[in-house]
């Protein structure tokens, strides 16, 4: 498995990963184009056997002295192999901000557990954040 920078050439693969991982919450096409082209965003893809199996975008917000992990997803059949952890760690290396945040569905216990293992703490809950009205847990890592 390799972690590499992602680009607009990866749009089709990213769309497949996004739809497989997030079903009803998958980002629309224009948002995917934006995340692959927006300046300063850290875009990483996980490749296994020539296939994109995971993606992460990190959004540095230097004026706020923080960064957001905008999205992280690994194809379901490749989960629990350390790919999400590898993407997260590589992105953290590339983001200089002292504070990192992300949000996750409150029902996504495997992801919450991973983030806790990586030093993220729950700092807020956004009520009815997702399309189906499920709340999001906001997690933060200070370094």
Locations of regions flagged by a protein language model:
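Extreme N-terminal starter segment of soluble prokaryotic enzymes
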Residues: 1-3
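Acetyl-CoA-dependent GNAT
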Residues: 5-79, 85-94, 142-143
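Well-formed, non-transmembrane alpha-helical positions, independent of function
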Residues: 13, 113-114
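Conserved hydrophobic/aromatic "anchor" residues
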Residues: 22, 55, 78, 114, ...
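Conserved GNAT acetyl-CoA-binding A-motif
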Residues: 88, 94-106, 126
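Structural motif
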Residues: 95, 117-118
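C-terminal "cap" of GNAT-fold acetyltransferases
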Residues: 101-112, 118, 128-143
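A secondary-structure capping/hinge motif
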Residues: 122-124
């Amino acid at each position: 498995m390799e972690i590499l920078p992602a680009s607009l050439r990866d749009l089709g693969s990213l769309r497949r990963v996004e739809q497989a991982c997030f079903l009803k919450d998958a980002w629309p096409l224009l948002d995917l184009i934006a995340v692959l082209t927006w300046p300063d965003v850290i875009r990483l893809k996980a490749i296994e056997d020539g296939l994109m199996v995971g993606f992460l975008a990190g959004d540095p917000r230097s004026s706020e002295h923080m960064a957001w992990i905008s999205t992280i997803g690994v194809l379901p059949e490749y989960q629990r192999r350390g790919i999400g952890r590898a993407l997260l760690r590589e992105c953290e290396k590339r983001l200089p901000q002292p504070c990192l945040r992300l949000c996750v569905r409150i029902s996504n216990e495997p992801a919450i557990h991973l983030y806790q293992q990586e030093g993220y703490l729950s700092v807020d809950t956004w009520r009815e954040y997702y399309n189906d009205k499920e709340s999001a847990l906001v997690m933060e890592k200070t370094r």
